[in-house]
């Protein structure tokens, strides 16, 4: 059995009870933290919390050489952990299908993820989100500034009145950076303000799931100059606003009246 | 006032009169006597003593040049000569004749308007003669001919007037055949063949310092009969006084070579692709000393006191100290610290050097041989590509770890001075690679590092540079990214020989206007549609984008090219460069989000797919080969041809020429390492030979695996090939 367990948004307490039980029952516990990580904890604290040993896999160890995970799942109970939910944004559906190919049973235990927090914290309704996109570091993609596909996505959503959830790039163990790099919401707002539209409204969500989670709405140009503290951040570019959404952004996200 | 100073002042006066300037190069096969001739000209102009000319070899200033008795670097010199009552300023470049140093010849030709081709009367036109004439004509440089060592025909071979005439006419005929072949298709060149009647051919002996030409005979009244008499009776001194070589040759230079005003309007369109209607084009055509400054750097040298010196041709404007100039291909400006002209091996600083001259400049720290230097940003000159490419590599290490930084700096400097040298720095292992034109080329360069820089080095055995090439067309191959969300569908086809040749010669590149590129490719036989879809030219391979309207592909294309470049630099057989592949992208499936189709996904997907397609296209190892010509007495002919055949070589022709037999053939460069000593012992030192790099050839199938494993082992790669390789 291979069980995909989402660890939730912030620290070792963000996992669901069902997830905790699955980890406790597993023979082997694997995890990947190259797509995202729990900012409020580390692997050692997680191991202590769950009283288990976590085998951390890098990108190649998941995408190119998943055999050890699959072998463990074929022989016994294995769990595979990621931050957030295992099947949203970073989709590990490929790993699940490879397991199915080998006749291994699989199940998914969900957890809160950035997409649900974005709606949950900003008051923007999840019915009114369009396609999501990721803003990469300028050096990490094949074009200059902001990739056309990012602004195309935002604009296509806005034409239909829809909000865009913009994930911000994370580089873990990347040869180009020392340590880990997390794009901040102000860097993202600056990139979009410079390459797209400085007057457009943006909503920053910082440290979703943490006790000090922060939400701020303002023009992108103004968000570019603000500091939202430690990671992880994400950014929402709203489309048209329902009146309740407008009120929420003003009340809960401090949006200045002239920006709405 | 010293004599030298006087000449410098005379030169400075003449520099402002382009009509009076001749920029020339002396070029020839090795040992045909260029440098001795140059000494004669210098002595004639009063630059060195008459007595030592011929032995002094004033131009061979490097210690190793004097030791080896050959010219290695192209050297510059200026002199004055009076012809028909007018003083002329002659800027002269002596070039190396040995084939390994051909890059210097090519670069020198860019700076000059006339090439004095020197041919040995006894040996006749040789392979290197053909190469230098070709190099000159390609650059739009006008040739004249000096047939040297005529004294040997008279004294050694005891030839009579008729035999001599026949021999000289055949040399002229050979050279003219070359000239006709190269200029037939050029409409901007009238008849450039040389002839005795026109005065574009001179004869003589650089060693004994006499010379004749049709005009000189008319002037002095000395005909061939008189010359034979004097030479036979050993009255060479008299011969020299009556008809001195320097006057005969320098008169020919002044009369028959174009001055910059005549030459530049014709040469600029050949060597510069910028806007012909621009002000700068006009100023270059007119050799306008008041126009914008344009200098084409053809040589970088190092002076122990002044540091790096850039030498080159001033095509427009006037170079002065303190100017801030752009250097093509680099950002920012360099400040000119001094300007000068050359006298022998020495540089004389002057206040300014106007258009039409060859200048020596310090302070251009970013310039390399081939840079365009100007006071406003401009289209650079056509790159001076020397057509032969590195075929031999040696590893080079500093003996003392402390010398490591200095060695790296020196290696970089060497490749800056000689673009036919290529350097691969490996800071991790400290074992660097230096690649060049041949064994001698590398030996000279490494000795110079030891001697001039005082860095003791250890060098490895010379290694041949291999390549990999597809020998058939592949089926469609699917490349999948590690996350399996992105797929690329590609094929590999063989590039036609004609297209490959155009890339090799630099006639087609991504730097040229698209329309022009299409035309060249179509003329070389590429179909129209393919030529319109060229996405990139990667090394000597072409990448075609056959896809239509795939969303997000445009922002992924750079990564696709990165993946292709990786796979083509390190081929699947032995990580040697791939050439001659036409890679076609037929279709692609991409993830919606940029982060899931980033470098970590796209590069491995395309790199793998290209390697698999290359294997499917029966990729094979290519090795460099050389044309070999051996001149040998008939009793040693068997031994000589055996030396070629024993080296996996092929003898194509054997024929008699004079009292010698000539053996012609080809052999792999790898097997030719160590040829010099073997042929010497096989023929008791009686053979003279010449080799010339002749491109790459597919290696025989029964050797493929063995050589590939040798290379893989040397590179520390796995010594097994992918199982899918079954075609040899």
Swiss-Prot record, chain A:
Homodimer. HAMAP family: Diphthine_synth. Belongs to the diphthine synthase family. This is Diphthine synthase. It catalyses: 2-[(3S)-amino-3-carboxypropyl]-L-histidyl-[translation elongation factor 2] + 3 S-adenosyl-L-methionine = diphthine-[translation elongation factor 2] + 3 S-adenosyl-L-homocysteine + 3 H(+). S-adenosyl-L-methionine-dependent methyltransferase that catalyzes the trimethylation of the amino group of the modified target histidine residue in translation elongation factor 2 (EF-2), to form an intermediate called diphthine. The three successive methylation reactions represent the second step of diphthamide biosynthesis. The keyword Amino-acid biosynthesis does not apply. CDD domains: DHP5_DphB (cd11647). The keyword S-adenosyl-L-methionine applies. Gene3D superfamilies: Cobalt-precorrin-4 Transmethylase, Domain 1, Methyltransferase, Cobalt-precorrin-4 Transmethylase, Domain 2. GO terms for biological process: methylation; protein histidyl modification to diphthamide. It holds the Pfam family TP_methylase. S-adenosyl-L-methionine binds at residues 9, 85, 88, 113-114, 168, 208, 233. GO terms for molecular function: diphthine synthase activity. It comes from the Archaea. InterPro entries: 4pyrrol_Mease, 4pyrrol_Methylase_sf, 4pyrrole_Mease_sub1, 4pyrrole_Mease_sub2, Dphthn_synthase. Keywords: Methyltransferase, S-adenosyl-L-methionine, Transferase. Its EC number is 2.1.1.98. NCBIfam families: dph5. It comes from Halobacterium salinarum (strain ATCC 700922 / JCM 11081 / NRC-1) (Halobacterium halobium). Pathway: Protein modification; peptidyl-diphthamide biosynthesis. SUPFAM superfamilies: Tetrapyrrole methylase.
Curated annotation (Swiss-Prot), chain B:
Residues 19-261 form the tr-type G domain. Belongs to the TRAFAC class translation factor GTPase superfamily. Classic translation factor GTPase family. EF-G/EF-2 subfamily. This is Elongation factor 2. Signal peptide: none annotated. It comes from Halobacterium salinarum (strain ATCC 700922 / JCM 11081 / NRC-1) (Halobacterium halobium). CDD domains: aeEF2_snRNP_like_IV, EF2, EF2_II, Elongation_Factor_C. Disulfide bonds: none annotated. Keywords: Cytoplasm, Elongation factor, GTP-binding, Nucleotide-binding, Protein biosynthesis.
């Amino acid at each position: 059995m291979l069980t995909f367990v989402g660890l939730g948004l912030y620290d070792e307490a963000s996992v669901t009870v069902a997830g905790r039980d699955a980890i406790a029952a597993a023979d082997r516990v694997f995890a990947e933290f190259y797509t995202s990580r729990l900012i409020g904890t580390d692997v050692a604290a997680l191991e202590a919390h769950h009283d288990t040993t976590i085998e951390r896999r890098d990108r190649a160890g998941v995408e190119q050489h998943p055999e050890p995970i699959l072998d463990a799942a074929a022989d016994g109970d294995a769990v595979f952990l990621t931050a957030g939910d295992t099947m949203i944004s970073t989709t590990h559906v490929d790993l699940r299908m490879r397991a199915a190919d080998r006749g291994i049973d699989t199940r998914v235990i969900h957890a809160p993820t950035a997409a649900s927090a974005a709606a949950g914290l900003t008051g923007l309704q999840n019915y009114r989100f369009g396609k999501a996109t990721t803003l990469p570091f300028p050096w990490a993609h094949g074009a200059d500034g902001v990739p056309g596909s990012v602004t195309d996505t935002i604009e296509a959503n806005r034409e239909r009145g829809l909000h865009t959830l913009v994930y911000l790039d994370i580089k873990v163990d990347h040869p180009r950076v020392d340590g880990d790099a997390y794009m901040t919401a102000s860097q993202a707002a600056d990139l979009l303000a410079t390459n797209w539209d400085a007057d457009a409204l943006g909503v920053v969500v910082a440290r979703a799931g943490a006790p000090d989670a922060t939400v701020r709405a303002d023009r992108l140009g103004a968000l570019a100059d603000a500091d939202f503290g430690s990671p992880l951040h994400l950014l929402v570019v709203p489309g048209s606003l329902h009146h309740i959404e407008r009120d929420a952004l003003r009340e809960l996200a401090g949006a200045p009246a002239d920006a709405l | 006032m010293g004599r030298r100073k006087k000449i410098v002042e005379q030169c400075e006066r003449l520099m402002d009169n382009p009509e009076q300037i001749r920029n020339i190069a002396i070029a020839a096969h090795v040992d045909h006597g260029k440098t001795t001739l140059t000494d004669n000209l210098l002595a004639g102009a009063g630059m060195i003593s008459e007595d030592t000319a011929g032995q002094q070899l004033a131009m061979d200033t490097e210690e190793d040049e004097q030791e080896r008795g050959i010219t290695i670097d192209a050297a510059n010199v200026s002199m004055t000569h009076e012809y028909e009552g007018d003083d002329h300023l002659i800027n002269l470049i002596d070039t190396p004749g040995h084939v390994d140093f051909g890059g210097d010849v090519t670069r020198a030709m860019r700076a000059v308007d006339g090439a004095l081709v020197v041919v040995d009367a006894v040996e006749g036109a040789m392979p290197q003669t053909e190469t230098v004439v070709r190099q000159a004509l390609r650059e739009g440089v006008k040739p004249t001919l000096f047939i040297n060592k005529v004294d040997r025909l008279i004294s050694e071979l005891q030839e009579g007037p008729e035999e001599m005439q026949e021999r000289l006419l055949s040399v002229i005929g050979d050279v003219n055949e070359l000239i006709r072949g190269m200029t037939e298709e050029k409409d901007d060149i009238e008849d450039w063949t040389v002839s005795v009647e026109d005065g574009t051919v001179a004869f003589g002996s650089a060693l004994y310092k006499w010379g004749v030409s049709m005009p000189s005979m008319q002037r002095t009244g000395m005909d061939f009969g008189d010359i034979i008499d004097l030479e036979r009776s050993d009255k060479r001194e008299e011969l020299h006084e009556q008809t001195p070589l320097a006057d005969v040759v320098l008169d020919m230079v002044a009369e028959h070579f174009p001055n910059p005003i005549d030459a530049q309007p014709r040469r600029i369109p050949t060597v510069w692709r910028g806007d012909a209607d621009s002000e700068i084009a006009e100023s270059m055509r007119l050799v306008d000393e008041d126009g914008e400054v344009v200098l084409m750097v053809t040589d970088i040298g190092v002076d122990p006191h002044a540091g790096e010196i850039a030498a080159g041709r001033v095509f427009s404007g006037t170079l002065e100290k303190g100017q801030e100039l752009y250097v093509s291909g680099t950002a920012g400006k360099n400040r000119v610290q001094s300007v000068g002209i050359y006298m022998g091996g020495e540089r004389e600083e002057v206040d300014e050097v106007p258009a039409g001259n060859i200048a020596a400049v310090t302070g251009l720290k970013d310039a390399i041989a081939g840079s365009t230097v100007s006071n406003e940003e401009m289209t650079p000159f056509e790159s001076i590509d020397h057509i032969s490419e590195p075929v031999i590599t040696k590893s080079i290490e500093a003996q003392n770890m402390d010398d490591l930084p200095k060695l790296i700096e020196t290696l970089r400097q060497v490749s800056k001075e000689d673009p036919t040298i290529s350097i691969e720095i490996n800071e991790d292992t400290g074992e660097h690679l230096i690649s060049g034109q041949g064994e001698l080329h590398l030996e000279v360069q490494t000795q110079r590092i030891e001697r001039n820089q005082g860095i003791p080095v250890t060098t490895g055995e010379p290694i041949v540079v291999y390549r990999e090439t597809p020998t058939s067309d592949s089926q469609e191959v699917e490349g999948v990214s590690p996350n399996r969300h992105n797929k690329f569908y590609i094929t590999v086809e063989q590039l036609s020989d004609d297209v490959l040749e155009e890339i090799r010669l630099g006639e087609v590149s991504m730097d040229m206007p698209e329309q022009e590129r299409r035309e060249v490719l179509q003329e070389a036989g590429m179909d129209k549609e393919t030529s319109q879809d060229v996405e990139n030219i990667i090394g000597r391979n072409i990448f075609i984008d056959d896809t239509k309207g795939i969303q997000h592909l445009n922002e992924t294309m750079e990564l696709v090219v990165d993946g292709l470049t990786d796979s083509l630099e390190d081929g699947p057989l032995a990580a040697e460069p791939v050439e001659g592949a036409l890679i076609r992208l037929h279709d692609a499936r991409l993830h919606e989000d940029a982060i899931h189709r980033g470098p970590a996904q796209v590069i491995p997907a395309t790199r793998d797919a290209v390697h698999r397609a290359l294997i499917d296209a029966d990729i094979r190892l290519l090795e460099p080969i050389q044309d070999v010509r051996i001149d040998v007495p008939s009793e040693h002919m068997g031994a000589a041809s055996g030396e070629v055949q024993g080296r996996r070589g092929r003898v194509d022709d054997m024929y008699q020429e004079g009292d010698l037999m000539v053996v012609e053939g080809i052999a792999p460069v790898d097997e030719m390492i160590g040829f010099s000593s073997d042929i010497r012992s096989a023929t008791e030192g009686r053979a003279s030979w010449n080799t010339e790099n002749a491109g790459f050839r597919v290696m025989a199938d029964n050797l493929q695996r063995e050589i590939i494993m040798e290379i893989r082992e040397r590179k520390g790669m796995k010594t097994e090939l992918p199982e899918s390789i079954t075609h040899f």
